[in-house]
Amino acid sequence: MMWGSRRRTRSRWGRSGPMTRGMGAVSRAVGTAWRRSLQLRVVALTLGLSLAVILALGFVLTSQVTNRVLDVKVKAAIEQIERARTTVGGIVNGEEARSLDSSLQLARNTLTSKTDSASGAGTAGTFDAVLMVPGDGPRAATTAGPVDQVPASLRGFVKAGQASYQYATVHTDGFSGPALIVGSPASSQVANLELYLIFPLKNEQATIQLVRGTMITGGAVLLVLLAGIALLVSRQVVVPVRSASRIAERFAEGHLSERMPVRGEDDMARLAMSFNDMAESLSRQITQLEEFGNLQRRFTSDVSHELRTPLTTVRMAADLIYDHSADLDPTLARSTELMVNELDRFESLLNDLLEISRHDAGVAELSVEAVDLRSTVQSALSNVGHLAEDAGIELQVELPAEEVIAEVDTRRVERILRNLIANAIDHAEHKPVKIRMAADEDTVAVTVRDYGVGLRPGEEKLVFSRFWRADPSRVRRSGGTGLGLAISIEDARLHQGRLEAWGEPGVGSCFRLTLPLVRGHKVTTSPLPMKPIPQPSPSGGQSPSTGPQHAKDRARQREHAERSL
């Protein structure tokens, strides 16, 4: 039972206890506020430095006051003991018939009785007297007063014939606390007579405590005033900076008319004017760029529409000539075939330009229906399969055994897949192209993997640029226009999906399309890894990464790739 109780106690108040978690939360909150608030740092640093200065000054001033008060006390005590020596000498030397003990007691009573009078006490204040004649051989010491309160070190000086003083804590009938003890040899006929005066430091201690309390109170008030001053001063700087930050955020959101108010002619006013000048320049340039972009989009759209009419006429004439190409000279027949092929490519380019202009104008719309994406993949393969056959490239397809129903625009998704497969065929270098599909509860992914030339670092983003080509000298077998991947990524975004690329020179490349199964949902993960898992060489031989150990490595890589998503 006892061990169980200890375990429960550690569980409650240990590292994972509520107190520790609460302290951790407070620490994180303070750290966050310290990092994010310039005003907090300024006020805290001002208070810290001010506190250090006040403590240093307080220590110096307190030391000076203490030393001054004690110096005055010592000076008055020395004057008092000089007068006491004369009094003691007169009493001890007055009547020889009196015993030594009686003489010492009479002298002590005479000295202490004078302290009851303000005029007799002088500036040294009240005191108690101690008189002592050390013993000599069998004769015991003769004393008067609390001799046990006199420090032995002070007695050593007095025995040597020197006047001295020492601070000590005394405990007498009338006082208990710090005191100043002054000792001196007495001038009398009695040999080795020692005189000590004990001056309580009660009043001096009260004076010093009053000074310390006053300084502490004054320091606390000064700290509060300095905190308020630092807060007001820092606010004069922080408020315009915060205003500039808020206006910059609104400016970045598209509110191009936002400006900072200009007040006065100081540094903050110059900052506001510079910010407004910058905002005005950026607003003007952004407006110009928007106008140029709109003009470019209108030009592309208008040219595409205007070219469609003459293209239709030329197409009709070319088809008519092509239908009678058998009756023409072989040279003319070949020219007719080339003309028809180029017209097909030109018509495809116009269609792509029109599609791009729709995306740029934000008028592209989805025609969503619930379909089995496996049939969409098969349809895309049937459209570009002849390209693989002509190039002697094997298409390896892995599709799920069960239906993959998704709410998509079939035409756009098929166009994405068609572009990806055609692009892979163009860069496969006569090696197989692998198409895989996988789905989870929320998303579906299709990867198109080739083992051709691959991509250099940084080209994963460039491949989706318009008219971009990694190698301009490479011939497109698919007859593409250079806009296929640019349109594909726009179609993927229209579905709130993702289209990503990966590649390494000489290893190949992989394109992954990830779409939500339900329209309107966002893609956060993908059921297929981006970086392909090492596979056996497409040429038919075994790659170096074979064997049981490498199989385990591939499994770990697959797990790591899926977790990284």
UniProtKB/Swiss-Prot annotation:
Quick one: where is this thing mainly located? membrane
Write out the catalysed reaction: ATP + protein L-histidine = ADP + protein N-phospho-L-histidine
Annotated Gene Ontology cellular component terms? plasma membrane
* Region called Disordered, residue ranges: 1-21, 524-565
One Pfam family per UniProt: HATPase_c
Keyword Lipid metabolism found: no
The signal peptide, as residue positions, is: none
Single GO term (MF): phosphorelay sensor kinase activity
Ranges for domain HAMP come to: 235-287
TM stretches of this protein: 42-62, 213-233
- The Histidine kinase domain, residue ranges: 302-519
Compartments where located: Cell membrane
Compositional bias annotation for Basic residues: 1-13
Which of UniProt's keywords are assigned here?
ATP-binding, Cell membrane, Kinase, Membrane, Nucleotide-binding, Phosphoprotein, Transferase, Transmembrane, Transmembrane helix, Two-component regulatory system
Role description: Member of the two-component regulatory system MtrA/MtrB. Seems to function as a membrane-associated protein kinase that phosphorylates MtrA in response to environmental signals.
Record-linked PANTHER family: HYBRID SIGNAL TRANSDUCTION HISTIDINE KINASE C, TWO-COMPONENT HISTIDINE KINASE
Q: What is this protein called?
A: Sensor histidine kinase MtrB
